[in-house]
Design a protein with these regions (language model features):
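Active-site microenvironments that recognize anionic phosphate/pyrophosphate groups
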Residues: 1-86, 90, 94-113, 117, ...
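Conserved, mostly hydrophobic/aromatic
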Residues: 121
Length: 257
């Protein structure tokens, strides 16, 4: 059984927070002051997180755009594919390091996502003593079929991690990245324009579960249900609602770019 990660509260209090208040200076916009850079590709920068609040981890950040603007679903397909490919490469590279039991790769967007910085970015965190595979299984990636083609399979979770609506994108590690990026953009547009139209917040998470596939789980964010907070009980919708979501998301998934 995994032990909880320890969070450094005092260091956390020093982090800049501008996800709600745009008057707070963005630490990612002034690139001349960025340090501990690990790699770059065009305007994308991978660097160490200046605020390593989680003990026994290797926290890094991928700055995806040059400015605070540029939510992933609004980007040109080629730029989205470039960002996704860079992130996948660095995640897979980090997973090869023997000092980590598992490696997280995820993105926050919006004030209810748990993030602190508005500037588009994602995070890769190596965990020295925590193996997320003990908590997450392939069953969490299964569900009602929303779309399937030669590159991806998209489902709505019947066994979500937290609920209510979790969208899973399954693909082979050698799948061309552009169609995966396009499908991710389409799911995010659906989430932002329908389910999450009030909070405008989401997360997406990457998983490798040693079953021959990689997964992206898109989660629309709201206030967390007390059933999960108090009892770890996830919730999902019924068949009728799932059928409606299948119909509603279809127009978003029809486009090929």
């Amino acid at each position: 059984m995994n032990k909880p990660l320890r969070f450094n509260i005092e260091l956390g209090r020093t982090k800049p927070v501008n996800i709600r208040d745009e008057q707070v200076r963005c630490p990612f916009c002034d690139r001349s002051k960025l340090t501990d850079i690990l790699d770059t590709s065009g305007h994308i920068i991978w660097l160490m997180n200046k605020y390593p609040v989680l003990e026994k981890t290797w926290p890094t950040v991928i700055i995806e755009t040059e400015t605070d603007e540029g939510e992933f679903s609004t980007l040109p397909a080629d730029e989205a594919a470039h960002i996704l490919q860079f992130g996948l490469d660095k995640w897979r590279e980090t997973r090869q390091r023997q000092e980590f039991k598992s490696v997280l790769f995820f993105k926050n967007h919006g004030y209810m996502s748990g993030g602190s910085i508005r500037h588009p970015h994602s995070q890769i965190i190596g965990l020295e003593n925590y193996d997320y595979h003990k908590d997450i299984t392939a069953q969490n990636m299964e569900g009602w079929l929303l779309h399937e083609d030669q590159h991806v399979r998209i489902t709505l979770s019947t066994h979500p991690i937290i609920g209510f609506f979790e969208y899973n994108i399954r693909f082979k590690p050698d799948t061309p990245v552009r169609p995966v990026a396009i499908r991710l953009q389409q799911v995010l547009r659906y989430v932002l324009h329908t389910l999450s139209n009030l909070s405008q917040s989401y997360n997406y998470f990457f998983y490798n579960l040693e079953d021959g596939y990689d997964y992206i789980k898109v989660v629309a964010r709201y206030v967390t249900t007390p059933l999960y907070v108090g009892y770890k009980i996830p919730q999902t919708c019924d068949e009728e609602r799932a059928a409606k979501i299948t119909r509603d998301i279809a127009p978003y998934l029809q486009a090929t770019k």
